[in-house]
Amino acid sequence: MAQRKNAKSSGNSSSSGSGSGSTSAGSSSPGARRETKHGGHKNGRKGGLSGTSFFTWFMVIALLGVWTSVAVVWFDLVDYEEVLGKLGIYDADGDGDFDVDDAKVLLGLKERSTSEPAVPPEEAEPHTEPEEQVPVEAEPQNIEDEAKEQIQSLLHEMVHAEHVEGEDLQQEDGPTGEPQQEDDEFLMATDVDDRFETLEPEVSHEETEHSYHVEETVSQDCNQDMEEMMSEQENPDSSEPVVEDERLHHDTDDVTYQVYEEQAVYEPLENEGIEITEVTAPPEDNPVEDSQVIVEEVSIFPVEEQQEVPPETNRKTDDPEQKAKVKKKKPKLLNKFDKTIKAELDAAEKLRKRGKIEEAVNAFKELVRKYPQSPRARYGKAQCEDDLAEKRRSNEVLRGAIETYQEVASLPDVPADLLKLSLKRRSDRQQFLGHMRGSLLTLQRLVQLFPNDTSLKNDLGVGYLLIGDNDNAKKVYEEVLSVTPNDGFAKVHYGFILKAQNKIAESIPYLKEGIESGDPGTDDGRFYFHLGDAMQRVGNKEAYKWYELGHKRGHFASVWQRSLYNVNGLKAQPWWTPKETGYTELVKSLERNWKLIRDEGLAVMDKAKGLFLPEDENLREKGDWSQFTLWQQGRRNENACKGAPKTCTLLEKFPETTGCRRGQIKYSIMHPGTHVWPHTGPTNCRLRMHLGLVIPKEGCKIRCANETKTWEEGKVLIFDDSFEHEVWQDASSFRLIFIVDVWHPELTPQQRRSLPAI
């Protein structure tokens, strides 16, 4: 309407303005008026488009653009990840995205910014600017040309400037520090871990043991490793591995599980940052057991991830200065050559991060074939094999990964961070398979390569402990404490060794101060166990305070029940009746045949052939206590059974005891004047039966938790030895009993087959 009104007023004005002029000028014909009305321009010029037509075309073009955009997104016609990744290389001012300021810099209208890129609070993380910017060289040329054309046009639209002739944007400014965040996540290189996305074992909740976790080394700071590589936006020439939760398979034949009461040997709680699982190697005709995977409590996990951090530890980590110390520089995993093939490495790593393990293995194998001197390609291959071993539960594949980690370390020009991570992971996986001596050699090499890294020396000390070499372990921790006297990890392990050497009072301050330090790897059930035990032996009443603290921190089921190799959910009580166990037939058989069992035991004693061996677990305060074992870890001792053939034949009828791989069947003789310290057994998976054979009338008693009982000849006592128990023999003659361990009645058949032996 406005346009039409203007046209009319224009005509009237023309008529009145000319007055009595010529008729051709003074009045317009209808045709002329129509021409003016529809063909004229609002400024009086003819021949242009009307406003209405212009608006219509504008709307058509806008709608066409909208629907085109919808079609592009809907049909996935453009790989936005790829395009955005291309735009990222033109981030000239380092603010993490491509905008008008970047365009001005590239067109020479603005000085290049030297400020640090701003990081949103949710993404804030300490990082270093890359030392060397390397253009991405492995992208297809046609994609790069297309991206450049898009960038050129976009630049000029945003700044309304003349096209810069002959300017090569890629040469003007190489790749900067922040590619797309999704790519960053996939660029992270464990796990195992651990991590490595956790692969849950295929067992029901009640079949999963309650794990007590230990962070075994102070190189824990580096051992968030092996799974995520560092974000390229912060350091494009490096990658940061992060521990994955790894659950693999244990070569049980290679590991001797020590009874927890034996204090002279550091138990093989293998593998920092991992949770141990086992695949039993069954006979080929029994495929069912081949898939048995049980989460074993002899596992080592970062305490911070698995347990509620105690107040003392919170006090330590809540300190801002302490947090600043924890922050570490992210490792650099790419050498100069690997930077030139970074795009190919990233593509292969992206497959691994997306869980396409088989494809990732093939991709890294191809990279190793093409670039045999590339440490990062070979490291990626090792990680993929590591992941594949986890996926397939294959020790054979894991052995291949261990070998590939070694190959990484043998290449020339390996970045120091990558070398350290490769060898640490190799050592970790060797321990996992029970190859303790091989792991020790790897740790020794690490210490030689990085002599100033005390965390590696702490790892080395653990390596010695795992093979029972307490003397060398002690030397290592003495060296660490001479350099860093407040190293809590070294303190608890040094105290552990002193206690194993029966230096009880001397061990207490090291164990206590080490736990109180809150350092990683110190919140370990074994250290609470041995600290409390040491205090009990010197008469320190604070022992139960530490047991209580260990219970609150999740290491013990209760103050009384302090076993560390446990299955969740099992009924827990100190004393049991035969009916409660369900093993009434076994109890009746033992009590009916107690004289037969007694006579064979006495005959073995009379032969004086040394079949009764002294107790060697350092459980006695004083006295003489010996044992004669018929079954151990579910295995019959044929030589021993020759001395008690009828007893062994009798027991063969009861698999709940002969098949108990977490217990023993044995004679136990204790002479007058013997006192056994308060102690607990290693596991809640068994119950212990005591059959009285030769019992003095008075002076012999046993306490379990807070109830004390005495033996009777021909009668069975049943208790759960995962509860604290203590024995006195103050009679005038020896005491002989027959000990029979049985599976806890609530364990399923599958658990009984699958649980590792103790």
Swiss-Prot record:
TPR repeats: 341-374, 454-487, 489-521, 525-557
Membrane-spanning parts: 54-74
Keyword Iron on entry: yes
EC number of the protein: 1.14.11.16
Annotated positions of the Phosphoserine modification: 14
GO molecular function, one term: calcium ion binding
Residues engaged in binding Ca(2+): 91, 93, 95, 97, 102
Pfam families reported for this sequence: Asp-B-Hydro_N (PF05279), Asp_Arg_Hydrox (PF05118), TPR_16 (PF13432)
Superkingdom, taxonomy of origin: Eukaryota
UniProt-listed InterPro entries: Asp-B-hydro/Triadin_dom, Asp/Arg/Pro-Hydrxlase, ASPH, IPNS-like_sf, TPR-like_helical_dom_sf, TPR_rpt
Subunit relationships: Monomer. Isoform 8 interacts with ORAI1 and STIM1. Isoform 4 interacts with CASQ2.
Annotated disorder: Facial dysmorphism, lens dislocation, anterior segment abnormalities, and spontaneous filtering blebs: A syndrome characterized by dislocated crystalline lenses and anterior segment abnormalities in association with a distinctive facies involving flat cheeks and a beaked nose. Some affected individuals develop highly unusual non-traumatic conjunctival cysts (filtering blebs).
Name listed for the protein in its UniProt record: Aspartyl/asparaginyl beta-hydroxylase
